[in-house]
Amino acid sequence: MAKETPLMKQYNQIKSKYPDALLLFRVGDFYETFGEDAVKAAHTLDIVLTNRNNGTERSELAGFPYHSINTYLPKLVKAGYRVAICDQLEDPKLVKGIVKRGVTELVTPGVALNDDILQSKSNNFLASVWLGKQACGAAFLDVSTGEFLVAQGDKTYIDKLLQNFRPSELLVAKHQKKEFAEHFGDDFHCFYLEDWVFKDYYAQQVLTKHFQTNSLKGFGVDELTEAILTAGAILYYLSETQHHQLQHITAIQRIAEEAYVWLDKFTIRNLELYAGNTTPSVSLLDVIDKTLSPMGSRTLKRWLALPLKKLDKIRQRHEVVDYFLKHIDVLEQVKTALSRMGDIERLISKVATLKINPREVVQLRASLEHIPLIKQLCLASANESLTLLGDKLHSCEQLSARIAETLSEDAPVNIAKGNAIAKGFSAELDELRGLSHSGKSYLDDLLLRESQRTGIPSLKIDSNNVFGYYIEVRNTHKDKVPADWIRKQTLVNAERYITGELKEYEAKILGAEEKIAQLEQSLYAELIAFISEYIGQVQTNATLIGQLDCLCGFATLAMENNYHRPEMNEGYAIEIKDGRHPVIEKQLPVGTPYIANDVYLDRERQQIIMITGPNMSGKSAILRQTALIVLLAQIGSFVPAASAQLGIVDKIFTRVGASDNISMGESTFMVEMNEAALILNNISDRSLVLLDEIGRGTSTYDGISIAWAIAEYLHEHPSKAKTLFATHYHELNEMSEQFERIKNYNVSVKETKDSVLFLRKLTEGGSAHSFGIHVAKMAGMPQYVIQKANKMLKKLEESHNVVPTAEVVKNAQKEMQLSFFDMNDPLLEALKEDLLSLDINTLTPVEALMKLNEMRKRIS
């Protein structure tokens, strides 16, 4: 067996406790990594990988200076590693043999307080998911802000939350690893915990102990049994990662599914609400984020993820935006104050976790000093919501004053550097500093006094390691030495003496530096303890400042982009005049106007708008802008339209674009059908449905059949969900003749001899041409291909002129409705039996569509 060195024996013992983490092992002035950890660290950090002898074995080694930890740690964490930081727990100078070491912190992607790891505009959520038999639970904690949220629902709802909150790390029970991956994919940094962590008795115990309560009823989450399991798992994980200072986590909040608009993961992706991980496209958030503080940016992301359904709350936000637009002077004053606010939410969390440094405390004070003005402006506003917000704001004037009198304005980052405590705060500290800083002048003064008293002109003060400070007198003057001097040493030409005053000064000055450091540490610790009493107040301020910042941002957005206030109501209709796409209009070349469009939808007369028109004509933009206008209105923003009267929408569904899901073994068409099925299974009477090019992933007749069936299903469904249905199947225009609430519209095109001009205007009536070859020409297709395509198109049109496709579809629909079971045909008889044997109560819409498609093939 290989013999280990004492150091490697200690390393291996510690590493065995953290097998899943990359261990940074402090050795002198370096953090070292060994073995596989060294290989990973060298690759990720681009540092040198070497080998060293560890007893009789050789091992890989890679390291970096300890003072560079804040440079290298973020790179490891962002690469997805859990990093255990092992420090020296003793002073090597005072220890014989091996220094005691231990892990002082375990930093993971979801549990980080380092500013270089965190993004100021985004939360850093640690999430946990439990897949129960009846429901699923989820919890989200941002340890850097103290926000703790729980939710419970089906897998689709949990999936939606994961897409919106984008956790940096996800905790899952080991036995649910496979099931989780099947439902939610493998795009998350997952860590797998033992199953017992997700037990009810443990979760209840750890949560009530943390919040110091007898139950969770006061938080309104006691009935969310599955969600409570995940919240308990998160607190367990924090304990395991050496995060014990958690007094800033003061509450646990329920994400009330019924209070917010349903946005499934497809809708979030299709509407491009957030910037993609791979594509550099401009997102809605990029365009609408006019916030000035980190709290505002994070709040806006939350609002976008959770649009409101309560009419009164939506109107309250609109009222505040309206007030600011009518009182620009107040808006500018508030914005100026907001722009000078630091991240008080994360700073106060650092107080709780004892991670805050003196300079950050000064930043906290500087931010808090703007609160009284904001409070005053809100209280004087005469706007009910702003007045209430101002009333809830805490001035924290005592806190600001205490920080100001305790800390120097230019306090260092590291308390050990000294001069953090302000002059005049502590008389003892000032005296010690005086001794330390004015030692030479004191000795010069002492020398002058003693020389005058004794009449000895050539006195000299010096010191050595034997008896410290002394006065040296040449032999020619030793007869003048006073009686109170004590002789300590005789030299050839001189004698050395000490005095009472000199020994007293020596005692003071020798201990001054050490005492200064200890006293500054002690006074700083007292200040942090004082600030800790204000954690709740500062957290409340952070929440309110985030909300206020969002509303100021909405006002700025409306001014800059000509947005108008939507009129919200309890009805069902959507009426938009001159609506615009908020993102596309910002991407147009300077001077190019955006072509605005009107959209009207209701449940009585115009439930489904069938939009036809060529590719590139703007069909998809009209669909998306309608949803985005509704979404913006329900988060409290004004909208890019001349006017908008909007009934509350509770769900927004989109089936837009085409993409394969190769990793899950699904084709474009299968992805399309899955998304369509999700929509049809979840529509409500307040849903807004956007369908773009349904059926294009399969053959023409299959596609038309499925698109027709879906449109008919939506029309006949009791919910009468409002729908925008964009298609290049012009045959679907026939539906308006048979279904009273389906109306045809087209995106107008001006056709010339050799080309087409896309007018991008939505007009009544269907379109009979797709102009696909014109689009191919605009894309730069070779002339040969264009000419060949035109010839083929002409031949195909001639061959189909006898019975146009639209007529075939129309007649087929009539036949299916009127005489399907009247014909004495064995095939139809068999189909009839198949139909009657189907259990429509258990059949999903997609299965129904597939069955319908199969029957049509058998007929043809």
Each predicted region: which residue ranges?
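ATPase nucleotide-binding head domains, primarily ABC-like/P-loop NTPase cores
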Residues: 2, 19, 35-36, 224, ...
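Short hinge/gating elements
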Residues: 51-63, 212-223, 274, 284-288, ...
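Charged, surface-exposed helical/loop "interaction arms" that form contiguous linear patches used
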Residues: 353, 357, 367-370, 388, ...
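Extended, charged coiled-coil "arm/hinge" scaffolds of SMC/Rad50-like chromosome-maintenance ATPases
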Residues: 408, 491, 495-529
